[in-house]
């Protein structure tokens, strides 16, 4: 297991597995192809290398990011569409070997985060002030509602260099 703090375009070496969680939505759409091409180049050619991308996305065509989210939470973040992601993966030389839409998961995650946040609100208020408390509570609440009632969801996308080399169809290999 290796962690590196650097621009993804500067990563060197080759890897059996690459996992990126909550990262892709911070890549500019003009670099989607570059992102997946870099993953392609970083995966080993041994036939069983896999990349798992876990990203917030929209079921609608690409559109603007919510102004509140852009200003206060994820400045410059993007919410990619399935069509943008698929096109970039195909152009990179990778093959999609698995795609899962986690529709009802993230709103529950946000609800759990909010519950824990509110249990510790007094400590957080001392450390960050009242404005932060209101902002963070609004963020967690509104995003939970957005994931429950709008077009937002989480995609979990598995990509490989060679589809025929996927280590199994049962996904048991993920847990080893």
Task: List PLM regions with ranges.
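Hydrophobic/aromatic anchor residues within beta-strands of the central parallel beta-sheet
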Residues: 1-3, 51
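A short glycine-rich, Lys/Arg-flanked "PGG" loop and its adjoining helix->strand segment in the class I
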Residues: 33-50
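A short His-aromatic
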Residues: 10, 25-27, 31
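Flexible, glycine/threonine-enriched loop-and-boundary segments that flank and lead into catalytic domains
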Residues: 4, 14, 34, 138-145
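Substrate-binding/catalytic lobe of Class I Rossmann-like enzymes that use SAM or dcSAM, i.e.
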Residues: 55-167, 174-176
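A short acidic, Gly/Pro-enriched loop at the edge of an enzyme's catalytic core
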Residues: 5-19, 151
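A conserved beta-strand element that flanks and buttresses the S-adenosyl-L-methionine
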Residues: 19-24, 52
């Amino acid at each position: 297991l290796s962690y590196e703090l650097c621009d993804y375009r500067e990563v060197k070496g080759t890897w059996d597995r690459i996992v990126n969680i909550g990262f892709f939505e911070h890549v500019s759409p003009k670099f989607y192809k570059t992102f997946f091409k870099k993953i392609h180049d970083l995966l080993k050619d041994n036939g069983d290398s896999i990349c798992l991308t876990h990203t917030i996305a929209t079921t609608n065509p690409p559109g603007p990011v919510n102004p509140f989210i852009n200003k206060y939470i994820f400045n410059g973040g993007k919410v990619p569409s399935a069509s943008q992601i698929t096109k970039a993966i195909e152009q990179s030389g990778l093959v999609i070997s698995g795609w899962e839409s986690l529709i009802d998961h993230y709103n529950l995650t946000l609800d759990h985060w909010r519950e824990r946040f509110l249990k510790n609100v007094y400590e957080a208020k001392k450390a960050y002030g009242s404005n932060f408390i209101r902002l963070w509570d609004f963020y967690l609440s509104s995003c939970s509602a957005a994931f429950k009632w709008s077009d937002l969801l989480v995609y979990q996308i598995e990509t490989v260099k060679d589809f025929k080399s996927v280590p199994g169809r049962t996904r048991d290999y993920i847990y080893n």
